[in-house]
């Protein structure tokens, strides 16, 4: 699909609220049960921004997408790192997996491109991590599953190359303006969205959380709200006049850092 395409949705002036959640990780049965049991009538006039890491399994993605599409007026998605794992797939690379997930979104009418809802624009920003938040230590290099579960074509020799590839998909989106602009990514656009209370020994994961170059694109777009996932640490913080929001559902054990519910980031006038 053409990732730079922009779609205008007419007749959606009745959209009332924009909700977000990320990192559903529905390979945990209790997480799958939660998403499938969402109220079937409460959100029919609302938009959901689903900021990645639902599942690496395409069948699980289909199940989740079909359920959410029946409950929301529109569902916006962006693949996370888990969606691009290929260790159990018959695909040659994680880029092929990205295209497979993109095609799935297209076939199920899940939005993976910029959409304008009259006074509101919702803009996906693709990315990866590039070690601009720090260099991975030996422990992270050995433990981080992406380094084994993802496979990239030869021309993408480094994580920085992968990040550049995805950032290039965003370039035509960065001059979009509207009364309200919400952008979203899976990865973190700046490391200072992480709370100061994170213990030092947990910060060893920071190199694989996101990219300063993604942050530069967010600043260029200058949205009202930027939604991100990946860190599993819920957050809502304003930095340089942009509200950064994380509402990761996270793993079942991560109750202290995750709300475990949908989060409304915007309510529009009816």
Regions found by a protein language model. Give the residues of each.
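Active-site-proximal loop/helix segment associated with metal-binding centers of metalloenzymes
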Residues: 123-205
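Active-site environment of divalent metal-dependent phosphoester hydrolases
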Residues: 25-30, 55-59, 82-89, 113-115, ...
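Short amphipathic alpha-helices and their capping/turn segments at secondary-structure boundaries
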Residues: 38, 62-69, 106-119, 166-179
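N-terminal active-site segment of His-dependent metallophosphoesterases
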Residues: 2-77, 84-92, 270
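Binuclear metal-dependent phosphoesterase catalytic core
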Residues: 106-108, 195-222, 232-270
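Beta-strand-turn-beta hairpins that frame and shape the catalytic cleft
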Residues: 11-19, 114-124, 180, 238-243
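Glycine/small-residue-rich loop that forms an oxyanion/phosphate-binding "nest" at active or ligand-binding sites
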Residues: 87-111
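Active-site neighborhood of phospho(di)ester-bond hydrolases with catalytic His/Asp-centered motifs
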Residues: 20-22, 48-53, 76-81, 113, ...
């Amino acid at each position: 699909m053409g990732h730079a395409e922009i779609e205008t949705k007419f007749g959606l002036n009745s959209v009332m609220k924009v909700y977000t959640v990320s990192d559903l990780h529905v390979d945990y049965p209790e997480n799958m049960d939660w998403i499938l049991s969402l109220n079937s009538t409460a959100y029919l006039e609302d938009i959901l921004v689903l900021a990645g890491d639902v599942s690496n399994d395409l069948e699980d993605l289909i199940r989740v997408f079909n359920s959410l599409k029946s409950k929301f007026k529109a569902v916006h998605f962006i693949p996370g790192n888990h969606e691009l794992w290929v260790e159990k797939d018959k695909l040659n690379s994680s880029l092929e997996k990205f295209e497979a997930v993109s095609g799935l979104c297209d076939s199920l009418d899940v939005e993976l491109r910029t959409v304008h809802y009259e006074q509101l624009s919702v803009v996906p920003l693709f990315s990866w991590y590039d070690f601009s938040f720090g260099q991975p230590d030996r422990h992270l290099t050995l433990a981080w599953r992406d380094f084994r579960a993802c496979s990239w074509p030869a021309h993408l020799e480094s994580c920085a190359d992968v990040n550049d590839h995805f950032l290039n998909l965003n370039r035509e989106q960065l001059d979009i303006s509207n009364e309200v602009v919400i952008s979203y990514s899976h990865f973190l656009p700046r490391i200072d969205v992480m709370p100061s209370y994170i213990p030092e020994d947990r910060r060893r994961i920071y190199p694989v959380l996101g990219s300063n170059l993604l942050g530069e694109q967010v600043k260029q777009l200058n949205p009202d709200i930027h939604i991100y996932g990946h860190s599993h640490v819920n957050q809502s913080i304003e930095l340089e006049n942009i509200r950064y929001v994380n509402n990761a559902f996270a793993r079942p054990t991560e109750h202290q850092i995750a709300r475990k519910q949908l989060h409304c980031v915007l309510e529009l006038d009816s």
